[in-house]
């Protein structure tokens, strides 16, 4: 499984040659400035999710708040019949809280998909300068 990141990552299950071809095609898209493959070991990956959950009574509301606290999520909106939770974390963490909240009734949910940065002090621009990689005829 390969992850190619250009803003939002694209997950593909392919060989190295096909992954390089896809990366080359992505570099031609506007406004892609840079493409870099990141391995799970060499990157920090997170996903942002907002979940609007039905919480029509105080008992449900308290349980939803407790679940949010356990996962270090934030309550970002409150109404008479619902709570909206924001959580940032690994895909497994997001999946786990989603599963727990389904019993209350998920009214709406949005997920960014996985975003990633390389670990350490180097940046994608540093790596591209070392490779002499060009986009739009300009060295990045």
Question: What are these model-predicted stretches?
Answer:
Residues 1-7, 11-140:
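Long, contiguous binding/interaction regions
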């Amino acid at each position: 499984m390969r992850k190619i990141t250009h803003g939002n990552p694209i997950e593909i299950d392919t060989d190295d040659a096909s992954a390089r071809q896809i990366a080359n095609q992505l570099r031609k898209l506007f406004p892609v400035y840079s493409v870099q493959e990141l391995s799970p070991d060499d990157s920090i990956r997170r996903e942002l999710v907002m979940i609007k959950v039905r919480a029509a009574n105080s008992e449900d509301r308290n349980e939803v708040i407790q679940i949010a606290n356990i996962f270090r999520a934030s309550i970002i909106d409150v109404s008479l019949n619902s709570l909206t939770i924001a959580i940032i974390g690994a895909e497994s963490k997001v999946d786990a809280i989603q599963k727990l909240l389904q019993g209350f009734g998920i009214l709406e949910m949005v997920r960014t998909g996985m975003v990633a940065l390389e670990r350490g002090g180097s940046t994608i621009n540093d790596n591209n300068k070392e490779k002499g990689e060009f986009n739009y005829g300009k060295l990045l």
